[in-house]
Amino acid sequence: QQENDPSESKLDLSLCAQRLLLMGCEYVLITGTHENTQQVRNTLFASSGIIRTDDWERLEHTYHGSGCTLASAIAASLANGLSVSDSVLEAQDYTWHTLQAGFRPGMGQYIPNRLFWANDEEDSEDEHEEKEVIIEQPEN
């Protein structure tokens, strides 16, 4: 098999997940963010096998904070009572949208916009345009 053969990669990732599960983890989520593919494939494993596999459109930039965003979103979903499988799906969806709305504050990687849902249509058209804010003082 070739070095970049997807079937070999999937087998290797399954073995990695099984090793982590044998060390005491209940679940292992392996993400495909660093693969050279058009889709990002994330797979959730348990001792019983694969729980779910989700494919996401690969975005064009590189990001700093995507893994932290995903882990935090999973934890928040679990804390709100969702099942592990549903938490992973919801967190992936949230994370993908934060990346899609991400921004580049300087010359480095893009940063997830974790408040993407709070942006209105005008803000998303030109995020860098300065907005004039007028605060009216109450009359005494």
List PLM regions with ranges.
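Short pre-catalytic strand/loop immediately N-terminal to key active-site residues, enriched for Gly-Thr
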Residues: 50-64
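Short, small-residue alpha-helix embedded
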Residues: 61-84
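Conserved phosphate/ATP/ADP-binding segment of small-molecule kinases
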Residues: 1-51
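Residue-level signal for inorganic ion chemistry
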Residues: 31, 67, 87
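Phosphate-handling active-site elements
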Residues: 50-52, 77-91
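Charged C-terminal helix
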Residues: 85-140
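Glycine-rich beta-alpha junction loops
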Residues: 32-36, 57-60, 92-95
